[in-house]
Amino acid sequence: MRHYEIVFMVHPDQSEQVPGMIERYTGSVKEAGGQIHRLEDWGRRQLAYPINKLHKAHYVLMNVEAPQEVIDELETTFRYNDAVLRNVIIRTKHAVTEASPMAKAKDERKVAVAEVETNNFEDAEE
């Protein structure tokens, strides 16, 4: 089986459907004997340029190891799902399991906010 990186963008009005879509797509990969190495829901983000007069979209990143048949099925599903604005599927040489730069930056911000809140709480006690 080959390794793939999949990114798809969902219409912002359909953001509540994203967890169901992720579950469906990961389920089809696992049913075929594949593996999900990384799954990141980046949430609603600003687009670099408008697509269908939209300025935001809900982004999802998946790194999977799957047979070609599953990837073909996912491509077809993306093509006929009106909620999916854009998608890209790239074959990679190795499984990518580390967090993406987007996820790392998000985690660093959470840690920084937690430290600031802790410092403010300690200052208030004194």
UniProtKB/Swiss-Prot annotation:
In the record, which residues are listed under signal peptide? Answer: none
State the coiled-coil residue ranges: none
- SUPFAM superfamilies in the record: Ribosomal protein S6
Superkingdom is: Bacteria
Tell me the InterPro entries matching this sequence: Ribosomal_bS6, Ribosomal_bS6_CS, Ribosomal_bS6_sf, Ribosomal_S6_plastid/chlpt, Transl_elong_EF1B/ribsomal_bS6
An example Gene Ontology CC term for this record? cytosolic small ribosomal subunit
**One GO biological process term:** translation
Listed A to Z, the keywords are: Ribonucleoprotein, Ribosomal protein, RNA-binding, rRNA-binding
The molecular function terms of the Gene Ontology recorded here are: small ribosomal subunit rRNA binding; structural constituent of ribosome
PANTHER family membership: MITOCHONDRIAL 28S RIBOSOMAL PROTEIN S6, SMALL RIBOSOMAL SUBUNIT PROTEIN BS6M
Its function? Binds together with bS18 to 16S ribosomal RNA.
**What is stated as this protein's family in its record?**
Belongs to the bacterial ribosomal protein bS6 family.
Report what the protein is called: Small ribosomal subunit protein bS6
According to its UniProt entry, this protein's organism is: Actinobacillus succinogenes (strain ATCC 55618 / DSM 22257 / CCUG 43843 / 130Z)
Q: Give the gene name.
A: rpsF
